[in-house]
Every structure is written in C-alpha cells, then in structure tokens.
Amino acid sequence: MKKYLFIALVAFLAVTSASAQLRIKMGKNSPIEKLGRAEIAITNLYVDSVDENKLVEDAIRGMLEKLDPHSWYATAKETKAMNEPLNGSFDGIGVQFNMVDDTLLVIQPVTNGPSEKVGIIAGDRIVAVNDTAISGVKMSKEDIMKRLRGPKGTTVNLTIVRRGIKDKLIFKVKRDKIPVTTMDAAYMIRPGIGYIRLGSFGLTSHKEVTIAMDSLKKKGMKDLIFDLEDNGGGYLQAAAQIANEFLQKGDLIVYTSGRAAPRQEYKAQANGRWRKGKVVVLTNEFTASAAEIVSGAIQDQDRGVVVGRRTFGKGLVQRPLTFDDGSEIRLTIAHYYTPSGRCIQKPYKKGDRLDYAMDLDKRYKHGEFTNQDSIHLSDSLKYYTLRKHRVVYGGGGIMPDYFVPLDTTKYTKMHRQLAAKSIVINQSLKFIDAHRKELKSQYKDFNKFLATYEVPSSLIDGIIAEGKKEKIEPKDEAELTQTKKYLALQLKALVARDIWDMSQYFQVWNETNEIVQRAVQLLTTGK
C-alpha cells in the first residue's frame, strides 16, 4: 500500500500548460451553476458553522474520486511536499538523519553542504535548534524539519552532542540550496559491465545519468545494466531525455493521446551516448509511470531487453491545474503509448480506488510474482517490436523479456515484524554510531569491506532479543535461521550506507538480488 501511495505521489507530470483556456458552460440549469448555488446555500444556511475552504476541497476530491485512480487534488502543502523530491533542491542545512531514542542522529552531512562546511560530522546528535530542545521531547520529525529548513542565506544555531566530547558543541549554520539527487548507485558490477540504479525521474536525473555513463565508460564499460526496480516515475521530460541516450535521432520514445489532447509524439532529439552498447533494463511490480516509458521505449526499439517482473501499469497523463493558493488538481487528460502502440495503463474501474490500490496484492496472491505461467496473455494483446519484430504484450505494464520470480523465502514474518517495530534500523544505527571510528579505520577500501566484512553475531542476537521484548518470536528453528541470514545481509548493507553512501549499500544488496544477477548472467553468458 505504501509503495502504491509513493507511485501515486511521483506519477509523472505531462508537460502541458495548465493555463490553457477552458470553456465552461454557464447559464440556467448548467451543472456548474447548480454546484455554485449548492455551495452558497450550504455556507450561508446550514444549521452549524461550515469551513468553506474544506467544503470546496472535499467537493473537488469527491468529483475526482469518481474518475480514474490518478486524478486527484492536493493542497498547497501537499503539492510542495510532492514536488520537492523531483525539483532538484531545497533550502536547508544539508544532513541525512534518522531519529534514534527520540534524538536526531546525523547519518551523513551532504558533501560540501552547509553542515559539513562548519564541521558537523556523521554520528553527531542535534539536541537543540536555536535554543529549542528537539531531543527527548517527542517532537515530530515534521516539526524538526520545519526548524532545520528555511530560506537560503538565513542562519540557524545547532546544539550538538558528539561522542567522546563531554561538552555540547554549538554550530552556526548558514542555510543553502541542498541538491536532491535521484540516482541511487553507479559502479562497475563486473569487468566491462556498468550498473546504474535510478530511484525516480526528477529535474536533475538526466544530468546525473549522463555523468555516470561517461564515468563508467572511462572505467571500461561495454555493457550497461539500467536498474529501474522500485522506480515510481517522475517527470515525462526527464524520461524522454534519458531514453534518448539509448536511441538514435528520430526514434519514437512515447506518444500520448486523449479525448481533448491530440496525439503528441516524443522522439529522440539526437544520437544518444549509449545507442550502441548492450543494455539490460531491470523492472519489478513497483516500476511505474516514467520508468515504464523508458523500459517500453528500449524494448520496442529493440535497443535492449527487460529483465525482472511485470511493471505497475501506470499509463495516464496528468495535467497540473494550479489554483491561486498553491493547491492543484492533477487531471488525467490522456493515455501514453509505447512506440509499438501498447497502452501501459492497466485496467481499472472508475470510482473504485480501493480495488485499484489492491491490484498488486491480488497479483501476488494469484501467483504472478512467483510463476510466469500465471499470466495469461491473449493474442489480442500481441504487439511487435519495431526492428526485430519480436512479440511483446500490452494489457497493462511492461512485460519482461526474461522473467525472474520473487524469492518469497527470503522475507520471513519474523523479519517483517522486527522491521515494522523499527528494531532493525534502530539497533543498526546504534551499532554503527558506537563502532564508526574503528570501521572507518579498518575498512578504508570498500572492496575489502565487501569481500571480508561479516556482521557480528552479537548485533544479530541483540536484535532477536529486542524482538522478544516485543513478543516477536519465530514459529520454528527454520524461520529463525532464515531471519538471521537475511539480517546479516541487511545489516551489512546498512553499515556500508552509513560509512560510505547509497551506492555502496546497493553494491552489497546486489550480490544477492536475483534480478540483478540474472542480468549479469545474461550479459556474461548470452543466455
């Protein structure tokens, strides 16, 4: 459900002007006149006082809920929160943090950011902001972020507790633009094989990906794995720019068409950086929207193959209609189609958003994630790629060329319960904080860490013990063994993230990621 909400939040924005003139039918007995009279009557005559703004907002939401599952209304606050992760930057102090024991723990200061420049380091605890205590007072994460963020150029005083130093430290931090990156990882996964993982499609995504491509080519990249697993989408323009890097000038990337929106085509504007080397795109059931555009374009143009599982199936174009108060309607105006003519949008019932939200759950129960044969495709859904005329299928989402089943034995019920109670993340953060100095001293080179580091059994046993306090116990010895095995991998990845960065986190995970390993096998053996 959380993944579905994320996909809805980052559903890409069609680059269509929201200021287009709309003809509204006015006059006696018109629907808009009836709606206006109803609002006036309720506001002025209803027995109790009425919040007029909320009344109108609820009416807008009510109308949109009767349409498709991706048309929706957002308040000004919600709109800002939704756009920020995709807009490339925000104003703040520049730290990655987590809350541990009701205290803000700095995971990493942003490189060359305001906090790093004044000397704040990983492991510092921020206990007060401008003399207001934020530690041990049960302040919400949202309220803490409000205090830390502010306009560029303004200053904030931070009170810091640092391990090994008795007295509290005071830092004056001048807020600045903090970059928001969308690329999770880029590295050479094998000799000659580069790997790029993109988390979403934002304003800076194209630049991030092209810089990574150029860097990996210098390191000897001949083939590329482009990982779009869990990528919920983002901006259409970013998707078109990135797809362009795999195609030749003039190649069709995607087209949109709707009742009031004539067909609009998006084509490669130039020869791409990676138009000749092999490419494998990775997808799963949480790959959506803009990520499906890129996957579909590469597949339909026969530039590469798709490995993984069927994607989410979000193929509706939204136009943002912005009100003066900053709130917005995201109104579906068209479908988008891959170059072969496939509509990516999966079927839905108008007005039944709960059914739509439960679609992935139904697909899981039907066996789609574990058994390729559970997906029955009729001949009416057949399409053909544009160059090699391979069969591909429509009907919702992008079907992979090579199916990789979900390993359901990895994730035990016990582990899910431990994670839900935040026991895993809290214990890992405490461990890293206590051993950060020795870990950095012992593992100056990440490759040595990847090859030799083993998570202490005491850390895993401590997590199991904390779970027992919350009445979380395995059903049998087999579940306990599998839970410990998975914890060892997860904790190693978390240590790598906190000592280095997200790229190293995924390097640890990818050694056991079946979809990634299938792509490596395909590129190294050809089958």
Please provide the spans of the model-predicted regions.
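Bacterial Sec-dependent N-terminal signal peptides
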Residues: 1-28
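Cleft-lining beta-strand/loop regions that shape enzyme active-site pockets
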Residues: 20-31, 35-52, 75, 105-108, ...
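Extended, small/polar residue-biased N-terminal targeting/export presequences
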Residues: 46-107, 153-185, 509-520, 527
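Structural motif
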Residues: 123-125
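Hydrophobic beta-strand signal
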Residues: 127-128, 254, 305, 330, ...
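Residue-level recognition of conserved beta-strand edge/terminus positions
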Residues: 129-130, 161, 347, 395
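Flexible, acidic/glycine-enriched loop-and-adjacent beta/alpha segments
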Residues: 305-337, 350-364, 370-377
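Conserved functional hotspot residues or short segments at active or partner-binding sites
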Residues: 343-344, 348-527
